[in-house]
Amino acid sequence: MPEEGGLLIRQGTIVDATIIAAPSSTKNKRKARDPEMHQTRKGNQWHFGMTAHIGVDVASGVVHTVKGTAANEADINQMAAVLHGAEEDVFADAGYTGADKRPEHEDRDVCWNIAIKRGIIKASPKGLRDLAEPVERALAQVRAWVEHPFHIVKNLFRHKKLRYRGLAKNTAQLHTLFALANLVIVKKTLLVQSRA
């Protein structure tokens, strides 16, 4: 078990999501795109595909939960699905603002470390901004660990586009890819333990 080897501490979770593109072409037998995939806008760019929501252990960087949804599903709606329930701290970006006030999180006794939106920091008075920026920078350094599994899956494993039709098959493949990403993340720790 990962807990026994010190690979999973379960004191805190970093939550994030990424969009994985699906083929948007209609040049197939059905003359249609995958009906389970949806399009969404991120900034001014439109994407068609699904979203991979993950929960990552703060101490080790190991992915403990993966949830796949259509791309148009809001990140905050899947937060409860990627928390394991035993964490003391939750770290998330500004897309999860207000998660601590949602009814599914009322009974959770955790410290919510959710980023403040950039516009709110810019609009605040200079003295308050000078206090908030170093705190936000420190929280961003913790949240940066959640990007490592995404880097491994999308860049090292080159999973930038979905290969199957439907959410079930693609989510199953994401579970496999993130499990393999966990092996890459803990490779040095496992090698040291095997030599001892």
Please provide the spans of the model-predicted regions.
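Acidic, contiguous segments within the catalytic cores of piggyBac-derived transposases
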Residues: 133-134, 139-141, 177, 184, ...
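A short, flexible helix-boundary coil/loop motif
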Residues: 133, 156, 188-196
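Residue-level marker of positions within ordered structural domains that often coincide
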Residues: 59, 158, 184
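Helix-centered, glycine/charged polyanion-binding patches within enzymatic domains
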Residues: 88-89, 94-168, 172
